[in-house]
Amino acid sequence: MQNSDSGKKTFLIGITGMIGGGKSTATKILEEMGCFGINADRLAKRYTEPDSPILIELVELLGSEILDEQGKPDRKKISEIVFNNPEKLSRLNQLIHPLVRKDFQKILETTAKGKMVIWEVPLLFETDAYTLCDATVTVDSDPEESILRTISRDKVKKEDVLARIKNQLPLTEKLKRADYILRNRGNIDSLREECKSLYSTLLGKML
């Protein structure tokens, strides 16, 4: 990815994987090594926060039941609705994704310009996000362990996690589509070694 107003190249790496599979951990390790991290979910989160700039649109799409006693959007209620209703999830994504993409482009053109950027995107291959990347990475993790980690981290039921997984491509398909694979089926030290090797490879591609 070449910046139009500068000869300095921004190298964009999209990273994805199964929910609870270690994407954020791998991203954090790569940030420690020198990458600039951008989390797509964090960018999207502001649009379902209590001070959401698209509150009216959210209520029109999902109903007033998503509001709490103070009239603010409740992210847990939103998740319960959309992850059990593919049509509403698709419409929510159509509403939020263009806004997130605009925020993302602004970061690329300012603070991330000329850097190796690791872009954490759960729906990297389900959307056109992968087409923007210079390289794509899928984190390979044990499915059952990933589910258990998500249950523990998010304090949700297994059926809720499975509903979210159902709205994504199978891990096997994400692995097929990726340029690189990060194995996360051991401890944190083994993942760190995987990240170190990947970083070295990608640095060579960038230079």
From Swiss-Prot:
One of its GO terms (cellular component) is cytoplasm. The keyword Cytoplasm applies. GO terms for molecular function: ATP binding; dephospho-CoA kinase activity. GO terms for biological process: coenzyme A biosynthetic process. It is an enzyme of class 2 (transferase). Its EC number is 2.7.1.24. Pathway: Cofactor biosynthesis; coenzyme A biosynthesis; CoA from (R)-pantothenate: step 5/5. It is found in: Cytoplasm. Residues 12-207 form the DPCK domain. Signal peptide: none annotated. ATP binds at G20, G21, G22, K23, S24, T25. The keyword Amino-acid biosynthesis does not apply. It catalyses: 3'-dephospho-CoA + ATP = ADP + CoA + H(+). Catalyzes the phosphorylation of the 3'-hydroxyl group of dephosphocoenzyme A to form coenzyme A. This is Dephospho-CoA kinase. It comes from Leptospira interrogans serogroup Icterohaemorrhagiae serovar Lai (strain 56601). The lineage of its organism: Bacteria, Pseudomonadati, Spirochaetota, Spirochaetia, Leptospirales.
